[in-house]
Amino acid sequence: MWREHPRRPGREQTGGRPLSLGLGLAALGRPGYVNLGHADDLGGRYDEQVMERRCHDVLDAAWVGGIRHVDAARSYGLAEAFLASWLAQRKREPGALAVSSKWGYTYTAGWSVTAARHEVKDHSLATLTRQLAESRALLGDHLDIYQVHSATLESGVLDDEHVLDALAVLRDDGSLTVGLTTSGPDQAVVVRRALEIERDGRRLFASVQSTWNLLEQSAGAALAEAHAEGMLVIVKEALANGRLTGRNRDPAFAPAWARLTDLAQGADGSTVALAAALSRPWADVVLSGAATVEHLRANLAATTTAGAAGGTSTAEDVLAEWAEAPETYWSVRRALPWN
């Protein structure tokens, strides 16, 4: 089964080494998100059926393109439900692709883009119990990895013995791979803390999902350590919620974008930025956050760019001076408007 080889999602279906690009559903399961230009992508069409079809279209394009890892969360609106209906309608069997989801945030926007609060964080045992049941009701045996959503030192989840014991039960019964995701300026600290947590003499967490991109590289060394210790490493926000695309109109970013565009040699500059993440030797899966088929196909092009000699290393050299301090990056990230 897939869970026995967590670094090789969907290997039976790809005829060899699986594509390292995955698909995240944060921008596809709800009307509002913080990606730059998200409202333009959806074009004001927020009807649930329309959004479900859009999600299915992107999932179809991902499957055709060789993607075999899909990531959702309880707080991504109807992302799990949309994924479940796609799996059923396309008759995908459990194990055909890796499915990861998350618990710890509750969606509260009521299908509104302008809600005062879009999600509420709660890492309690009660939330784990409730949301695990909800995820399993939708995804059943398709669910492979269940992750603590945005674990931080402040939330206390990594010191909550009741939660950790409950996660150990999931690990020990073999039903799920237990993972965590990280956010914020202390990602590296959290990743290393997760590496230390054990139950019954064995590491509890088998996967970690963190933000890494050309603007926010601070978790890289810790993720390399996690990879070396055998953890599945998933990269999210490789395009910095659109800040590493042409939608970033900040004049201060213009020189960096011009150089990325030059490096892309006729392709979109974001392809080079995504390829930089794909070329990390410790990154097992890099999630695309595409909300349209067109963006998904452009992201797929980065899988060939990542293998181009010298391309991504040059991008890193050029952008080193534009890399932000973690505190600055996450301050900007928190200020991105829901749209």
Model-derived regions, located:
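Active-site mouth loops of central-metabolism enzymes
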Residues: 32-53, 113-129, 154-157, 185, ...
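Short, well-ordered coil/turn segments that N-cap beta-strands
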Residues: 16-21, 66-69, 92-97, 140-144, ...
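N-terminal binding-site loop/beta-alpha segment at the start of enzyme catalytic domains
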Residues: 1-102
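Short, acidic/polar
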Residues: 47-62, 121-139, 186-198, 269-274
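Beta/alpha (TIM)-barrel catalytic core signal, keyed to glycine-rich beta->alpha loops juxtaposed to Asp/Glu
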Residues: 150-339
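Structural motif corresponding to the early beta-alpha repeats
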Residues: 94-125
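Active-site groove signature of glycoside hydrolases
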Residues: 134-156
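Conserved, mostly hydrophobic/aromatic
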Residues: 23, 62, 70, 83, ...
